[in-house]
Amino acid sequence: MAYKFDPKDETTNLSETGFYSDMERKRRAIGDLGMKMMQVMASEGISEEPELIRVAWDVIAYLTLDPISTTSIRRCFDALRNTFLIKTEEVNTGLRRFHIHRLTADGKLFAMHYFKKAPVESEYERFIREHASVHHGYLIKDTQKILEEKGIYDSVTTGRTENRIVISEKHACIPDIVGVYDDIRDYYEVECGTHNQKEFNYKCSKLAHVTSNILFVTQNRQVLKKTLMRQVEYWIDKVGRENLKELGTRVYLTTLKDLQNDKWTYIYDMTMDEPICCFGKKKGGES
């Protein structure tokens, strides 16, 4: 999705600052490497710093035949920030910590001026559009990667359209991730611990309509124990443990690190008042 100028977007007032007359100064300040990095961000939509560095090594170095150091690339990001062409945020998924970069409104106008083409929608912008937050989007991305690398599923999907399950005329369930192997479907919800209890109850009740195994992944043990477990237990009490037992419902909780190590951190199987720890689970929902 190409960028469409919106005067309400975060940008300076062009009529007051003379942005266009300042473009050449910005271009000189960021140098050739900065121009190439801007072109990569505008044309590829890459937001993760590690991916941008790989592109810089593989593409930019190939085009120029000059070696590029990681230090040079990080200085390039500093120059792009100092000229207000990009913004940088830190993301911690519990599995990895990294920076993401995105074009500012001024950066998009700069790209359109020099590259004669509107920037494509970035990964950052897509996550804002599709998910509760950018952080949530990257948690889903890392969870999907783990599940794909395990090789236990024939397909692992995260698209809202393809994952949508109609429950009734007015209600639908859209799991964050759907893993399919043979004729089995596993539904994963990736939690940041930001839902209020009412929203969480609604999510769990919808999932209980479509699956007997409710699978939650979160970023770390702290969020799992302080937020996710509390919310799960409240929902179980509200719906009724015996009712869920009759449905055969189980709730599985894990972190990204535990999932990577083939572990479910806790399981609520409705036959006991307390959750059980169960390690070594290699397929979603298996006991």
Labelled PLM ranges:
Residues 9-28, 119-127:
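Short, Lys/Arg-enriched N-terminal segment that forms or immediately precedes the first helix
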Residues 15-21, 25-63:
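Short amphipathic alpha-helical interface segments
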Residues 31, 180-185, 207-210:
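Flexible, charged surface loops at secondary-structure boundaries
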Residues 32, 46, 63-142:
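Interdomain/boundary linker segments immediately adjacent to catalytic/signaling cores
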Residues 76, 203-207, 231, 235:
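A general structural detector for well-ordered alpha-helical segments in enzyme core domains, enriched
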Residues 193-212:
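Mg2+/Mn2+-dependent nuclease catalytic core
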